[in-house]
Amino acid sequence: MKRKSRFWPILLGFTVLVAAGLYYVVRMFSVDLPDYPKVDKVTWLEQNWSQSQRGWMHHADQGTVTFSMPYEWLAALEQPTFTLTAGPPFLSSDYLDRFGFITADSSGLPVGFAHGGDLVDPKTAQPWVNPATGKPLTTVGLTCAACHTGRFTYKGTAVMVDGGPALTDLGKFRKASGLALFFTRYAPFRFDRFATAVLGPQADEKARAVLKKQLDKVLAGGRIEVDLDKKVAEKSIEEGFGRLDALNRIGNQVFSLDLERPENYVAQSAPVAFPHIWDTSWFDWVQYNASIMQPMVRNAGEALGVRAFINLTKSEQPLFASTVKVDTIFEIEQQLAGKQPTAENGFTGLRPPRWPSNLFGSIDTKLATEGAAVYADRCQGCHLPPVGSEGFWEQKHWTNENSAGERYLRVPIINVENIGTDPAQAQSMAERKVKLPSELGIDTDSFGSALGALVAKTAARWYDNQTPPVPAEQREIMNGNRQNGIQAPLAYKARPLDGIWATPPFLHNGSVPTIDALLSPAGERPKTFWLGNREYDPDKLGYLTDELKGGFKFDTAKPGNSNAGHEFSDTPGPGVIGPALKPDEKAALIAYLKTL
């Protein structure tokens, strides 16, 4: 009896010790998130999509497995908080909202989350199965809408913008999901709850042991990535709300993690603001640095970067086999693009939102008319005549028709030395090299060209694997009737400004919070400000920038974060594109931009 009576105090002491250690871990690695006030009303601005089109786009499955786990695991996770009893679910709408994810109207997942079919590893051609039932588990990952759906709040109303830049913090979300998995494995009693939710209450110890091994494998993969991040941390820049070093992250995922080559991993040194995507299907070049021509390469590359599974290393299975859903990606692009734009019909896919006068106040039409003249004098040379104007449709602004009868908008490409904005994103793509095995059949070490070739091979593998294989003519259509053009100029493109009022923060790296600040000399722009606030300022055209607990303090003095360039100033210098705007000119131009 004495031995038995001593057992429980020892067990209790051990449990307290483990709990204390985990509490320290939680305190050390906790994710600090903003608290947002509840809104009274939600409104989606009209942008030429039906409710069903919008709902489909919000959850279209590209084949991504962003969180390196099946849906059934994600649904069973608890939030990474310290508790011995059952914690709140990780997929709680209120919790995900704090990262910036928008609650969907009709789905249990937020906007931008896609729940797909069976999760099959292309390296083995085997499904990921529930060890208790033997049934395949299913995919879950991010889709386009996660990064390209905007939101503002204004006096208690949430205003949603399809195709606008999201205000999410994917870095915080990645950290939180990793901690949630860690706690699931090591926090007392949490694995038991997880196993019951995933396997069912009748699962035996053998099935639970297999599940634990699966979890250990995922955690080991996460540790590899954490270790790689530590090695490049000195050169990495925090992305924060509304930004991502997208191209470098895609490269790291494909050429380092998927290819199992740690030497190809680089710092996230060139974060960019999530771009708005209306009109872009009809640009001759896309990405901020005008680096990619073909829609399929752009979009399938994004899917790989958001962690679609791909086989680049196992010769037992076809190389370039992946979970990427090329057919869905084609449908996404079709819905964004619509038909060939014309002077009569304009853009017929996703359109920019109109200024919501009922919420933000009416536009001063007299002032806007004056602003049109300012735009013609100061902006039109780079950003083209206003969309919808007669001048916009002049042939000189468009390519000649291709064999499919399509033509594309020639977006002006401005050298970094002339525009004067932060060069990091353009330099990063131009200078990055990758080391590749000969088995891939890619004969370049240039990051951009290698990525273009790899994505094209991935799409081709999908076409070949269909029954029957997709014919050449249909492949051309699905690829967007454009060649796989890749370039890496030390330059940025100047796109049309329709809907620009709905796309803060500004400049490619998100370093200027409002249009009002952007139209001011660089020395008058905020040197530091907070990102993560959702409240919109209809006078300055941007988010409020007050200090926000759990938000992101943007420091323009850090590499990659410069707010210089694109400057109207009476002092000549790099990046000065015109004389300073007088206060009445600035007010008029702001009024005019609201009309676009």
Curated annotation (Swiss-Prot):
Origin: domain of life: Bacteria
Residues passing through the membrane, by range: 7-26
GO cellular component: membrane
Membrane topology note: Single-pass membrane protein
Main location: membrane
Keyword RNA-binding in annotation: no
Keywords: Membrane, Plasmid, Transmembrane, Transmembrane helix
Localisation: Membrane
GO MF terms held by the record: cytochrome-c peroxidase activity; electron transfer activity; heme binding
Protein name according to UniProt: Uncharacterized protein y4iJ
Source organism: Sinorhizobium fredii (strain NBRC 101917 / NGR234)
